[in-house]
């Protein structure tokens, strides 16, 4: 599909869909169908990977794969992580348990459609019966794609990619077991059914979303966090930060749209609910107590362990409630990078780390969304350590935005989009790149026009 045709489809969807998130229901990865009941949503469901947490627990992964009946495993990682103790511990465990394996270490930091397809072709030719992902979200998402497309050997890449960029096909094939072992405290991908990548043709991020993509088991070993460089810890931590804030302030599940006629069609991202709130609150409180120490004290196992746990907890929360504007705006930001290369990263290409692209708009976003649910924004600010006594509801957005800025400043985050290489002249392209993200931007508690999106990008040019 050409860029012109895709943008035409996007504009048609935008023009013909209600802007109020309480009456819009195209949240799944698939194309809209006449499958609603005619009544508003009345239920939510929670699903997540099995989680095992503890220092040194990664040594058990070989036994897990043996118990799953695996005989030939594809270990997906990247060129940096493959040299770290996390991979050595896993390989030793596989050897002790008699598990054959091959290592795929070509994962690209911030994957593209091309890099994911490279992994798919590797997996399709090997007849693996299980996958083990070790690394950050890039490795875990790449492993999800390799698992899916090697299980459906006839599928084309865009078949399963979210509409409107892809065809949004529902997953009906049986996937192989996937164990995810995160080495960064950020994406929460070890518990979610989402795989994100840059679609280079449109300079936009998109992904594949399905509960069937969730890893079979998440092995959360805080010892691996001690190898995270300072900047990686900071940027990944802000992904956790925004996962928790966005899921906590997302539209209520009962206001998301019409209930499906078949419960299997209930979307991956359903809106905030009482159970997702538990995970978000835990993550926000943990961030308040540990985030800054985890950045600047790399040997502080307690702080880094707690952030690792917060990442998983926030992942379970947003994996069901969803995220909204910070993530929706982040995708064209990272997709339109020119020459920015973050300090502390050994990437051979320009990139804006996902957590940085997400948090850079957060102050503007939460000032914008606060009028829709000020009590939620005040509670979020309080969970992050702000004093809320005497604060009027009208000031909820300002307080939460200032609280977010405080964390950004302490972490040494760049002062807005200008420092990432953008200017006001880029805003039309950034807005255009946000339009395909309706699947998540509709989960914001306040509807947006294109003018609103332009204003959010403009306010994010400078943060402090």
Curated annotation (Swiss-Prot):
Role noted for this protein: Catalyzes the cofactor-independent reversible oxidation of gamma-hydroxybutyrate (GHB) to succinic semialdehyde (SSA) coupled to reduction of 2-ketoglutarate (2-KG) to D-2-hydroxyglutarate (D-2-HG). L-3-hydroxybutyrate (L-3-OHB) is also a substrate for HOT when using 2-KG as hydrogen acceptor, resulting in the formation of D-2-HG.
Disulfide bond positions: none
Name of encoding gene: T3dh
Catalytic activity: (S)-3-hydroxybutanoate + 2-oxoglutarate = (R)-2-hydroxyglutarate + acetoacetate; 4-hydroxybutanoate + 2-oxoglutarate = (R)-2-hydroxyglutarate + succinate semialdehyde
GO BP annotations, alphabetical order: glutamate catabolic process via 2-hydroxyglutarate
GO molecular function: alcohol dehydrogenase (NAD+) activity; hydroxyacid-oxoacid transhydrogenase activity; metal ion binding
Primary location recorded for the protein, binned into one broad class: mitochondrion
Lineage of producing organism: Eukaryota, Metazoa, Ecdysozoa, Arthropoda, Hexapoda
Pfam families documented for this protein: ADH_Fe_C, Fe-ADH
Family matches, as Gene3D superfamilies: 3.40.50.1970, Dehydroquinate synthase-like - alpha domain
Family per similarity comment: Belongs to the iron-containing alcohol dehydrogenase family. Hydroxyacid-oxoacid transhydrogenase subfamily.
SUPFAM superfamilies: Dehydroquinate synthase-like (SSF56796)
UniProt enzyme class: oxidoreductase
InterPro entries according to UniProt: ADH_Fe/GldA, ADH_Fe_C, Alcohol_dehydrogenase_Fe, HOT
Protein EC: 1.1.99.24
Official protein name in the record: Probable hydroxyacid-oxoacid transhydrogenase, mitochondrial
Keyword annotations: Mitochondrion, Oxidoreductase, Transit peptide
A GO CC term attached to the entry: mitochondrion
Subcellular location(s) of the protein: Mitochondrion
């Amino acid at each position: 599909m050409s860029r012109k045709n895709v943008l035409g489809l996007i504009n048609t969807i935008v023009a013909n869909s209600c802007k109020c998130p309480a009456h819009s229901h195209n949240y799944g990865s698939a194309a809209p169908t006449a499958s609603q009941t005619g009544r508003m949503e009345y239920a939510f469901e929670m699903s997540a990977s099995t989680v095992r947490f503890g220092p040194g627990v990664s040594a058990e992964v070989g036994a897990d794969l043996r118990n799953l009946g695996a005989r030939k495993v594809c270990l997906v990682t990247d060129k940096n992580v493959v040299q770290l103790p996390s991979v050595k511990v896993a390989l030793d465990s596989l050897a002790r348990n008699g598990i054959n394996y091959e290592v795929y270490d070509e994962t690209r930091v911030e994957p593209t459609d091309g890099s994911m397809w490279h992994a798919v072709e590797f997996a399709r030719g090997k007849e693996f019966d299980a996958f083990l992902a070790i690394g950050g979200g890039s490795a875990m998402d790449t492993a999800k794609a390799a698992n899916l497309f090697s299980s459906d050997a006839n599928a084309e890449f865009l078949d399963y990619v979210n509409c409107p960029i892809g065809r949004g096909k529902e997953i009906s094939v049986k996937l192989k077991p996937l164990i995810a072992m995160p080495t960064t405290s950020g994406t929460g991908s070890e518990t979610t059914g989402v795989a994100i990548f840059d679609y280079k043709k449109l300079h936009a991020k998109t992904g594949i979303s399905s509960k069937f993509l969730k890893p079979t088991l998440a092995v959360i070993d805080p010892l691996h966090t001690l190898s995270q460089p300072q900047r990686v810890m900071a940027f990944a931590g802000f992904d956790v930060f925004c996962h928790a804030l966005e899921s906590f302030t997302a539209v209520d599940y009962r206001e998301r749209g019409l209930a499906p006629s078949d419960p299997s069609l209930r979307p991956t991202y359903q809106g905030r609910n009482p159970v997702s709130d538990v995970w978000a609150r835990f993550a926000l409180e943990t961030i308040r107590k540990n985030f800054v120490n985890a950045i600047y004290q790399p040997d502080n196992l307690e702080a880094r362990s707690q952030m690792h746990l917060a990442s998983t907890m926030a992942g379970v929360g947003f994996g069901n409630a969803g995220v909204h504007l910070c993530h929706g705006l982040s995708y064209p930001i990272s997709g339109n990078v020119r020459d920015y290369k973050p300090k502390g990263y050994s990437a051979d290409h320009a990139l804006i780390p996902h957590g940085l692209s997400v948090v850079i708009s957060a102050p503007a976003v939460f000032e914008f969304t606060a009028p829709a649910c000020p009590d939620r924004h005040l509670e979020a600010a309080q969970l992050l350590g702000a004093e809320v006594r005497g604060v009027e509801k009208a000031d909820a957005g300002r307080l939460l935005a200032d609280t977010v800025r405080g964390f950004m400043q302490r972490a040494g985050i760049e002062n807005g989009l200008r420092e990432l290489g953008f200017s006001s002249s880029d805003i039309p392209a950034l807005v255009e790149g946000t339009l395909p993200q309706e699947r998540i931007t509709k989960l914001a508690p306040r509807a947006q026009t294109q003018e609103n999106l332009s204003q959010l990008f403009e306010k994010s040019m400078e943060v402090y």
